[in-house]
Amino acid sequence: MEPKLRYTAVEKGDINLIDAYSTDAELKQYDMVVLKDNKHVFPPYQGAPMFKEKFLKEHPEIKKALNQLSNKITDEQMQEMNYKVTVKNEDPYKVAKQYLEKEGLAH
């Protein structure tokens, strides 16, 4: 089922349980409880930047900058940023910049 449809069905009371990404803004929006996956049925989701090799050769500084984010953003932080952008309609650039400044990765 399309992710947005899942949350619409939850909101309407049509369903009570869904599978979701732990970084979904809607988990916070609908005050949902996330069950622990103690059987590890769902693999961890970790976003990763992908570039064409040519681009990285032309902009080698990007690789170093992005590597500073490796294993830095928690699911809770990503969920909060997604919530600010998706639900509160905050500017994605500003939300990302605030995070980077808070973590000492941008000035």
Sequence positions of predicted segments:
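Active-site lining segments that contact anionic ligands and/or coordinate catalytic metals
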Residues: 20, 29, 44-46
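Ligand-binding "clamshell"
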Residues: 14-15, 26-40
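Short secondary-structure boundary segments
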Residues: 21-23, 53
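Short helix-initiation/N-cap motifs at beta->coil->alpha
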Residues: 1-8
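A short pocket-lining beta-strand/turn micro-motif at the edge of beta-sheets
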Residues: 15-16, 45-47, 62
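Alpha-to-beta junction loops
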Residues: 11-20
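Ligand-binding clefts/hinges and TM-proximal coupling segments of bilobed small-molecule sensing domains
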Residues: 61-107
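A bilobed periplasmic-binding-protein/Venus flytrap-type ligand-binding module shared by bacterial periplasmic
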Residues: 46-59
